[in-house]
Design a protein with these regions (language model features):
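Short loop/turn segments that connect beta-strands within beta-propeller blades
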Residues: 7-11, 45-50, 84-89, 125-129, ...
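Structural motif
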Residues: 1-5, 38-44, 77-83, 117-122, ...
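Blade-level signature of beta-propeller repeat domains, shared across WD40, Kelch, NHL, RCC1
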Residues: 136-185
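A short beta-strand motif characteristic of beta-propeller blades
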Residues: 12-17, 50-56, 89-95, 130-135
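Acidic, low-complexity, intrinsically disordered interaction modules
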Residues: 127-130, 148-150
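Residue position within the beta-strands of beta-propeller blades
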Residues: 31-34, 71-73, 109-112, 150-152
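Repeated scaffold domains used in trafficking and secretory/extracellular systems
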Residues: 18-28, 57-67, 96-106, 137-146, ...
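Generic beta-strand structural signal
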Residues: 8, 25-26, 36-37, 45-47, ...
Length: 186
């Protein structure tokens, strides 16, 4: 999708970027995204000043802001999960696992480890510490709340599973999701 800006009174519509933009993360009036045409660098668009800035000249995918850091998939190194600190410019590899997708919940990163022999939904600290298996297999749609993490098997909408976001891992089915899906069929 191209990025456009418009005033709240619907005046002054203008193109901000004449290229595809994946607006992966936004905070405090700044949209963070990776390039999609000539490179996959980290960019920001300041909605107040209208300026686009190159923040990190490194190829990445799905930049996600948490605190003062951008978490991203490293497209040059088998999609390992990394963290780029916007304050000091440091870059840290959090896991060398190939990662399909991830989500951040406070002090944890939940991610799908892509491994032909042992795929798993994983959880680790935001600094890459203490990786642990949440559930063996391939999962998608990792959604986090203040209480629970929800996910389901890749390619299947049900059942939806849940586990505590911050407490001990204890995966169970989220039965309310199943009931809603069955009701939608009727």
């Amino acid at each position: 999708m191209q990025l456009y800006a418009i005033n709240t009174d619907k005046s002054d519509a203008r193109a901000v970027a004449e290229y595809l933009v994946n607006p992966a993360s936004a905070a405090s009036g700044v949209i963070y995204y990776n390039g999609t045409t000539e490179d996959h660098y980290l960019y920001s668009y300041d909605t107040q000043s209208g300026t686009v800035q190159t923040l990190f000249e490194y190829n990445m995918w799905y930049p996600t802001l948490s605190g003062s850091s951008i978490y991203y998939l490293d497209t040059e190194n088998n999609y390992q999960l990394c963290r780029y600190d916007l304050t000091d410019g440091s870059n840290t590899v959090l896991t060398t696992d190939r990662v399909d997708l991830f989500n951040i919940a406070g002090s944890y990163v939940y991610y799908q480890k892509n491994d032909p022999s042992s795929p798993a939904l994983m959880r680790m600290g935001i600094d890459g510490s203490n990786p642990e298996i949440v559930a063996e297999g391939n999962y998608s749609d990792i959604n986090v709340t203040s209480s629970y993490v929800y996910f389901h098997s890749f390619g299947a909408d049900t059942p939806v599973y849940q586990t505590s976001t911050y407490g001990p891992i204890s995966v169970m089915t989220f039965d309310a999701a199943k009931a809603a899906a069955l009701q939608a069929i009727d």
